[in-house]
Design a protein with these regions (language model features):
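Conserved beta-strand-loop-alpha-helix junction that forms the acyl-donor binding cleft
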Residues: 103, 129-139, 157
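Conserved acetyl-CoA-binding loop-helix of GNAT-fold acetyltransferases
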Residues: 98, 104-117, 140, 144
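Conserved beta-hairpin
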Residues: 51-65
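Conserved GNAT acetyl-CoA-binding A-motif
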Residues: 112, 119-131
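Conserved catalytic-core motifs of GNAT/GCN5-like acyltransferases
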Residues: 130-131, 143-163
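Conserved acyl-donor/pantetheine-binding loop and adjacent beta-alpha core of acyl/acetyltransferases
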Residues: 66-95, 103
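A short beta-loop-alpha structural element at the N-terminal edge
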Residues: 1-15
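Conserved GNAT-fold acetyl-CoA-binding loop/helix
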Residues: 21-42
C-alpha cells in the first residue's frame, strides 16, 4: 500500500468507473447519481489531503480507499440506531474500489486491514463505514472484519442519500 499522488488520478478514476459499473450491475444505486459522485474532484481532494491510499500488486495499482481519521460530520447524526461509543474519536473508511481485473481475489480484505492498521497505529480505536442498502459486497466485507451494523446516516439531503452504517470498536 502507498499513498496516492496526483499522477495516480487517472488510474484511480478507471478503477472507480469499473466499480461504479459493478454496483449498477448488482442493482445498487450507490455511485449512480446524476452528480457523478464520487467525482474526479472528490479523489483529487482526497489525494491532496493525504487520505487516498492505493493497493499495489507489484507496480500495478489494483485498488483504492480513503481513510479519514478526523471523523466525519455525516456520522454524527445516526438514525434508526445508535453508536456503541458515540463520544469517542473515530476514523471513517470511504470509497473502497478494486480493479475489475483483480476482482474475486479478496484484495478488498487487504485494503480494509491496512486502513484499520494505519488508524490504529495513529491511536484510533473506533471505525465507521457507510454503504448503500444494496451494496452486499461492502456489507459482507465489513461484517467479516467484525463491524456491527448500528443504524443509518444521511450522506446528503435526500432519501437516496440514506446509508447503512457499521462500527468496529477495538480496545
Amino acid at each position: 500500500m502507498r499513498k496516492a499522488n496526483l499522477n495516480d488520478l487517472d488510474t484511480v478514476m478507471e478503477i472507480v468507473e469499473n466499480a461504479r459499473a459493478l454496483l449498477k450491475a448488482d442493482g445498487s444505486e450507490q455511485w449512480q447519481g446524476e452528480d457523478g459522485y464520487p467525482t474526479r474532484l472528490t479523489f483529487q481532494m482526497d489525494i491532496e489531503g493525504g487520505y487516498c491510499w492505493l493497493l499495489m500488486y507489484g507496480n500495478e495499482i489494483v485498488g483504492t480507499a480513503t481513510l479519514m481519521t478526523q471523523g466525519d460530520a455525516h456520522y454524527m447524526h445516526i438514525v434508526n440506531g445508535k453508536w456503541n461509543r458515540p463520544g469517542h474519536p473515530f476514523a471513517t473508511i470511504h470509497r473502497v474500489a478494486i480493479s475489475g481485473k483483480y476482482r474475486g481475489k479478496h484484495f478488498a480484505n487487504y485494503i480494509m486491514s491496512h486502513m484499520i492498521t494505519l488508524a490504529y497505529d495513529a491511536g484510533v480505536r473506533n471505525f465507521r463505514i457507510a454503504t448503500h442498502d444494496k451494496n452486499d459486497r461492502v456489507h459482507n466485507l465489513v461484517q467479516n472484519f467484525g463491524f456491527i451494523k448500528r443504524g443509518q446516516v444521511y450522506t446528503g439531503p435526500t432519501d437516496r442519500d440514506l446509508r447503512n452504517v457499521y462500527e468496529l470498536n477495538l480496545d
